[in-house]
Amino acid sequence: MNTNNKKPDENNINSAQKILILGVGNELLSDEGIGVRTIKAMSKLDLPPEVELMDGGTDGFSLINIIVETDRLILVDCVKGGSKPGTIYKFNIEDAPSCSDKFKTSVHQINILEVINLSELVGKTPETTVIGVEPNSISTSLELTDEVKAKIPRVIELILEEVDEFLKKKIETDKV
């Protein structure tokens, strides 16, 4: 589900850089749905035209084409790192291999980090940041646990900081 109604200025299509905020997870498994719930919360915000929100659900491989077409990817997901429920993790995709022993992202049909790595084989891997939240429960439930639900505002803050940083770098690069 693409939740961005904005279109870039047609005169700036070549210079516009696409930022994809991709929330993944299964809303039927309580905290596993944190990524999707964050995207729904962000859909109410007024975001820059370069930003696209996407509910990736549990799509796995079908996300590859979308990922290779973006310049900046911010992935929001449930991440099991062994810390206290509600702990927020933030790491770059380049750091993911060294984190793989400590972190497990989601329980989808395929690990989303594997999909991002596979995107390199079919095109390019965008600059990627993963923002994850330690789950309290991934049992069958349509509700997030209180510990995880309370973290959505902070996750959104972190996402917006990433967007601002990327757009500032883009402006500086364009000045050169």
What residue ranges belong to the model's regions?
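Secondary-structure boundary/capping motif
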Residues: S30-D31, T140
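Conserved active-site and cofactor/substrate-binding residues in soluble primary-metabolism enzymes
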Residues: G33, R37, T58, S83, ...
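Helix-loop-strand module that forms the ligand-binding subsite of alpha/beta enzymes
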Residues: V79-T128
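SAM-dependent methyltransferases
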Residues: M1-K18, D164-V176
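A generic local secondary-structure boundary/capping motif
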Residues: D9-N11, I64, L118-E120
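Phosphate-binding/catalytic loops
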Residues: E114-V176
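Nucleotide and nucleotide-moiety/phosphate-recognizing core
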Residues: N14-I21, S30, R37-G86, K90-D95
